[in-house]
């Protein structure tokens, strides 16, 4: 029995990756939940917006790398991120002007917006593939580890190593900052409050002199920024592939719904719930159990509850269970 | 099926993709404001011989006139379906007024959108969904003052003085308050714009008699500050008792008009609308 | 021009396009009857899927984004019905697998019973947890070794439990049944919730179904694919070695290879047309029947229908199951056409969202619209690529030879496909929101 090593193994294989993935999902889910709360539909193009943001960032990263600009130990992508955000904001605003605004003027039903977002999804997907191709792109550079397994072992003398990738640390730190800024904005600024008011009661917001078009514009800007950050962090941590981003829709939707659609706190909680369930259920617990149980009880198999290919199934099962018991999600939906 | 193909949702009610909570349902008569022009004389606010209906629908109001002057409380009463709320909505620009006019403070505002009427000084409290339930009481008041660019802390203090309970509950979500308190938030929100006239659509709907009396007291208190109040009321008797002016509507027409006392004393009105 | 004429012309347009594909190699056409028939066959299958989705969306407003899953279940049915029986697999572990699955199902049923009949509280949560965890481990204990032994049998070719060795045409209704069963389970859960969460449920289930097909090698060999599935029509090589066929082909003046491929594809086209017409007829009849009128009444005013004592959830479940069954049939037909089951190729863009484009473009609520949309969009889906290349050649014709931009543009032309589908969808939603053939 060796609880310390068990704890390190657990941290290394479950907690750290879970935190990073959870942060990425939370940022994605925040974007979905804001659109749901304020524009009142589920944006199927969100995954592709993330892909677009990541793509613009990657192009700028390559540009910076080619002229020798770097952020030292941090990934160059961080320098490119603001440009990625600006590009995505521009795309979101142009899309809103040319596509969505018409339906607002028509007072179209939310489900029509959902269909429109399908069209936007196809187009964005096409644009991204057209520009950068459907293949895998790696754009991570700089220091690979904050602490590598070998250094950790040397430092502590433990048998198990703990590796924290720079991208993982960066993901969590960025997510914390972004979420803090977002909540400050929504709860403390006049514009943020007007967005919440519009989400709460559109008619009354109008009567209070809040301009819906401005609210919508700010929403798209924030959502574009969130999507880009989430997309870039995910790409840095794993890799960038347009199709993967499209497939992220399911866990992102699941996170937003589990937390309660329209509720930003719920989106964050949902992101971590989904991420940790996926990681824990598809992780092979043999190592951790070997350390924490007496030898006589040590398991023979891998003690993996489900193969990693079933991670979607996990998100979905959690979703159903939550909805069965709390139909509006864990944090009552709708309180942007 | 809806006539507008963009509003045809095939009866879809999927909560995982669409969000209809708090969605806008207002159908203003004008989407863009038209011109206004100065007029001389007349009461402070008047909906003058208004005839009209919703959208392209049939006329609901017929030559209906509603007016209120400074320092007055004017009350619209009448049987169910008489067009009481409709008359007030017409004044607020939610009804297509085909003939007649709405004038406020020496200006013809018939062509304005509801939002622009708020800017011109109309404070409107809808009958339902009249607060931001997920926001705190104080945030509700702040949103009421959204169009103001000056310092509105004084106004907020005045609202708190008028409705002391709101001061205690300022940091509580408005949705958690009782029915009477919610109505106070709603009125307070409308007062935050410093309106020139306050319009209340059935402020006592669904509250207990005790709360109703208290609400009426507050409304009188607001009126004493010189703010004209136009109000639609279901509880005709109590409303007429505090009214300077009363309008009894029947089927979208003015049936009886007079001071509150006159109407209460009118045997015809008593027999038909006040239960003897 | 009357409406009917306009709609007929639209169908004629699609027909002419497919004919041109066979006749001429002008512009983006290939001039190959083979290719024309390939487009026609998948177009017919797409039309059937579109009918299935149209029934759900057009008649009941149900937003199903899991079409891919039902299609894949149809494909699975082909494997399970038509591949030869593998006795060794059944004797070594097949029975245990079935037992394990029954155990798993029983566990779920028990869990549902517990939540239904036990009073809420800590005790219920505890019992529920114990039942679920114990059930899971028992299931895995029976399941894992059985799967191991099944997968060990002749893994290069089989390694799965095989099928029933029945005629492949039986797989089509079986595919429908399999999809219907899955749809019933999903609908029961997602439509029964206090608010309706069908969209996310179908989105998730479809991914799960694909994950199961990809990973459960004992079932359909996973990503190793099942190839050489039995066909309802003769093989081309057999036809080519059949003297009477060769002779007949010669009398038409066609070489035997072309003749045989065209013969087989035309045979499929005929079969698919029969199924399409039958389903279309049934869907039209259902729509005009009292049942269809009730469905539309529910759609147009659910509250009123509920007040009249209609069980809206039950009706929605019915129509969801029916529509999904149709998608399952189409999926089975598709796998039969390909004569292989390749779980790795199922992609929601192609199998779910493209069908939605077909339904919306064709005209939601109109079965003929769905058929038109299915055929038309499928034609574009195939032909946008050569069109894009043509366009890019035109655009880049002025550019310097060997420039990087030119190379990139030409290379990326094939990705125009998704972009164009989105554009078509947006244009139709904007300028003809009821679709090309609107609901009457």
Model-inferred region functions:
Chain A
Residues 21, 160-240, 245, 264-270:
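Helix-loop-helix "hairpin" substructures at the membrane interface of multi-pass membrane proteins
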Residues 88-90, 250-274, 315-325, 330:
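Hydrophobic alpha-helical transmembrane segments of polytopic membrane proteins
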